[in-house]
């Protein structure tokens, strides 16, 4: 059975400075993300053992652990692709039009996304996703890595608001981190995800 693996980054750890420090990116990728990858692989192995023993309490526990760690792995894999040293500015083309249609303007979208990020209670994410059932863009607060994000929503843009993503540089002023994020958003990646979500997910929920 194939194992989950830690992805390589498209840029050096220090490439997002001064907006996100190299120290944060190195720890975030090589330690925190790596821990979720290991946790997901460990949960899969323990699930196999529990199923062989027909130990349903252990099965449920490890399914829960897998959901948490695999979601952490998935979210971070998107997170790294959503960032670029050549990022910033605004989206263009179909994504820009869809954002304006859904939120009224890019500035209104940005304000709503910023509010979602900075008011997360505890650990979580802000997420822009494509609703494959309603055919529209939506913003969600994601609690931990997987809660409050409905099935059928395709993540396009994520902002990690766990303290490990910003505390070494921004301390408790997470609002400044959320503002700095816009300087390194890789809109080309978000546009690519939007194009795939709107063209390849029809019938995903209801055939």
Swiss-Prot record:
GO terms for cellular component: cytosol; extracellular region; periplasmic space; plasma membrane. Disulfide bonds: none annotated. Gene3D superfamilies: Fe,Mn superoxide dismutase (SOD) domain, Iron/manganese superoxide dismutase, C-terminal domain. There is a cross-link at residue 202 (Isoglutamyl lysine isopeptide (Lys-Gln) (interchain with Q-Cter in protein Pup)). It is an enzyme of class 1 (oxidoreductase). One of its GO terms (biological process) is response to oxidative stress. The keyword Ubl conjugation applies. It is found in: Secreted. It comes from the Bacteria. One of its GO terms (molecular function) is superoxide dismutase activity. Its cofactor is Fe(3+). It catalyses: 2 superoxide + 2 H(+) = H2O2 + O2. Destroys superoxide anion radicals which are normally produced within the cells and which are toxic to biological systems. This is Superoxide dismutase [Fe]. The lineage of its organism: Bacteria, Bacillati, Actinomycetota, Actinomycetes, Mycobacteriales.
């Amino acid at each position: 059975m194939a194992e989950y693996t830690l992805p390589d980054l498209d840029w050096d750890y220090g490439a997002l400075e001064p907006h996100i420090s190299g120290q944060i990116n190195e720890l975030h990728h090589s330690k925190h993300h790596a821990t979720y990858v290991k946790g997901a692989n460990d949960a899969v192995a323990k699930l196999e053992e529990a199923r062989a023993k027909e130990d349903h309490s252990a099965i449920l526990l490890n399914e829960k652990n897998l959901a948490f760690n695999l979601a952490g792995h998935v979210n971070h894999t998107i997170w790294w692709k959503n960032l670029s040293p050549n990022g910033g500015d605004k989206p263009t083309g179909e994504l820009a039009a869809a954002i304006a249609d859904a939120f009224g303007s890019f500035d209104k979208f940005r304000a709503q996304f910023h509010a979602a990020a900075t008011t997360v209670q505890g650990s979580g994410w802000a997420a822009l996703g494509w609703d494959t059932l309603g055919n529209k863009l939506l913003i969600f607060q994601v609690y931990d890595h997987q809660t409050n994000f409905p099935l059928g929503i395709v993540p396009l843009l994520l902002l990690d608001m766990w303290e490990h993503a910003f505390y070494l540089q921004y301390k408790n002023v997470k609002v400044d981190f959320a503002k700095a994020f816009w300087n390194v958003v890789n809109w080309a990646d978000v546009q690519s995800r939007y194009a795939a979500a709107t063209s390849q997910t029809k019938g995903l929920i209801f055939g």
